[in-house]
């Protein structure tokens, strides 16, 4: 099965670097690396499609959410946002 390339926006990299909890930081990094195995990652992690947005999904890690878009033709996953649940759905 071909792997997907995961590209994260710089605000996602900033979010990860600003996390104080090292366990949470490694959990987020692991989740992003597991996305390379999309669509198998859908079964391994808490991933759901975002209603109203085509090919856009969210990963839930505790109170945090990671939003990503899947380009199936190019085999690329664009990670666009990462933030607390309270802040992420206001965007």
Each model region followed by its residue ranges:
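Enriched for short, Lys/Arg-rich terminal
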Residues: 2-5, 10, 16-17, 22, ...
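A short, surface-exposed loop/turn module that caps and links secondary-structure elements
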Residues: 33-58
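Generic low-complexity, intrinsically disordered sequence content enriched
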Residues: 23, 28, 36-39
């Amino acid at each position: 099965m071909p792997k997907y390339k995961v590209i994260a926006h710089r605000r996602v990299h900033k979010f990860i670097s600003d996390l104080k909890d090292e366990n949470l930081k490694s959990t987020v990094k692991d989740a992003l690396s597991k996305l390379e195995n999309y669509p198998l990652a859908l079964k391994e992690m808490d991933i759901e499609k975002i209603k109203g947005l085509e090919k856009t999904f969210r990963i839930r890690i505790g109170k945090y959410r990671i939003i990503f878009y899947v380009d199936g033709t190019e085999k690329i996953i664009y990670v666009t946002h990462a933030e607390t649940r309270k802040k992420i759905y206001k965007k």
